[in-house]
A protein has these predicted regions:
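Surface-exposed, active-site-proximal loop segments in enzymatic domains
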Residues: 35-39, 76-93
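Conserved small/polar residues in nucleotide/adenosyl-binding loops
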Residues: 122
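N-terminal basic, low-complexity leaders that serve as flexible interaction/assembly modules and, when applicable
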Residues: 1-75, 106-116
Length: 123
């Protein structure tokens, strides 16, 4: 039997596989928490623990990591009041060193570290 990584990549290439790979994506924070991850260790840990527990229980072939808590770009333009696409032109980059970017990288790295070697085929 192929490793999970081989199974997933063989299926993506269209090669014959012994079974269809199974994966998931799931959000582990509440709707209210989806934009409150910046500088919030509770939401950070909730996302890490949620991914780890789900993967241990379900044992999927691949996982789509969710950077829960970071779904609202930190811009004064981004709001429910945007009424036309032209308004979005004024959104400026926060830069790759911004804590909103850096903390997303940290949460994804922490989630990835919880996976066993066989599941390192995260897609």
């Amino acid at each position: 039997m192929a490793s999970k990584r081989d199974l997933v990549f063989r299926a993506i290439r269209g090669d014959e596989v012994e079974r269809v790979p199974v994966g998931f994506w799931f959000h582990f924070v509440t709707l209210e928490e989806k934009g409150q991850g910046l500088n919030n260790p509770r939401i950070f840990q909730k996302s890490v623990d949620g991914h780890r527990n789900y993967v241990e229980r379900i044992r999927p072939d691949f996982v789509k990591i969710m950077s829960d808590g970071f779904f609202l770009y930190p811009s004064n333009v981004y709001s429910p009041k945007v009424s036309s696409i032209q308004e979005l032109v004024s959104i400026e980059s926060i830069g790759e060193e911004h804590p909103w970017i850096q903390q997303q990288v940290e949460v994804v790295q922490a989630i990835r570290k919880t996976f066993s070697v066989d599941r390192k085929s995260v897609v």
